[in-house]
Amino acid sequence: MTLRPLLLLLGLGAALGILGGCAEADEGAVVLEFWAMGAEGEKVQPLIDRFEAEHPGIRVEVQQQPWTSVHEKLLTAFAGRSTPDVSQFGNTWVAEMQALGALEDLTPYVRQSEAVDEADYFGGIWDTNVIDGRLWGVPWYVDTRILFYRTDLFAEAGYDAMPTTWPEWIEAMRAVQAVQLDGGYPILLPVNEFEPPLILGLNTAELLRDGGRYGNFASPEFREAFAFYVGLYREGLAPATSGTEISNLYQEFDRGRFASYITGPWNIGEFQRRLTEHQGDWGTAPIPGPTAGTPGVSVAGGASLVIFEASEHKAEAWQLVEFLSRPEVQIEFNELTGDLPPRASAWEGSGLAADPYARAFYEQLGRVRPTPKIPEQERIAQTIRTYGEAAARGQMTIDEALAALDADVDRILEKRRWLLDREAEG
């Protein structure tokens, strides 16, 4: 045998010996595959190390996945019966995967759990994972939208706090515009964002009717919210521009061109880092409600933990979900990522509930509503954005936009109606 093949064989033998040693070290251990996305996938490992230390018979392989492609990858994995044991899930995906039969029903697990207590979770967030009375995911972190605003400009206009009703809110915006520099706007509502018209609509209406078969956007209830939204542009209180047309949101907010903005918890850190001239002159507030005595609601967002039905290690997978759901672990997760916990006890134990910027999120999370729990919801949200933008830019009247929105959503739901009708026929 020549020297080169001999060296290759020796190298292969050494490699196999190393692998054999690893296999021996892990012999008997259950290996869980856990998909986590974005920053969570990058930062969760210290918690996984703690879990493995507490559960020496379980090893967790974290696979970091990009948000931009993971949805398609999950569908491909389901088709190929190669789904992970546990995965982080955007809350709007739960209905789609549940309809495919991809998810394990977690209802019986929670009933027997001492770690996962439904009463400790924000109700609207928990409800995002409940379909047909069964639980398909456990909230991991929460997201919603509230108002970030320049407290000094509102105070100069005569408002020491953000109003709590729509009529007062619009009066406050008019007063703020009077004290802003020329070209200023009391609120920024980028027309390429679906969240503002969606949130306002959730305050007054059910988005779908007849059991989720048809759009409900031309209804008087949704029209009230949509007219309020479009009116902000037509009165010049908000610019009819997209986020991509604004070179630097934080600079414009700092110099007072925009006095308020509906956004999410990630911007607490961004505002703290990027505002220079007016670092002490901003605050947060819940979304105002349509009328007195009707507190404003916002959208229930965030991510949950699911177990796939195809997992061969469901008991161990549930142990991981339970561990990541413990309040003290959620507090550490918040410190690692900045993500907001879904459990009230984690807020209280961490001091987040008293934080001057986060406490408005804490208050708002007690008043959130899920979007329709159907697989088509993401397409519906983008359709709301399309016609919201058309009306905001003056390309369609309110009634034209709502009629077109209903028609498009009805087309999106055509297959759903067919399936529901077939099911009803037996």
Where are these regions (language model features)?
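Extracytoplasmic "Venus flytrap"/periplasmic binding protein-like
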Residues: 50-121, 130, 155-164, 252, ...
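Short, well-ordered beta-strand elements
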Residues: 28-39, 58-63, 85-86, 187, ...
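Conserved C-terminal helix/tail region of periplasmic/extracytoplasmic solute-binding proteins
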Residues: 23, 59, 155, 363-426
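Hinge/lid segment of periplasmic solute-binding proteins
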Residues: 91-146, 170, 199, 281-285, ...
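Glycine-centered hinge/linker elements that transmit conformational signals in sensory
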Residues: 173-177, 212-243, 287
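Extracytoplasmic/periplasmic solute-binding protein
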Residues: 131-140, 145, 167-215, 258
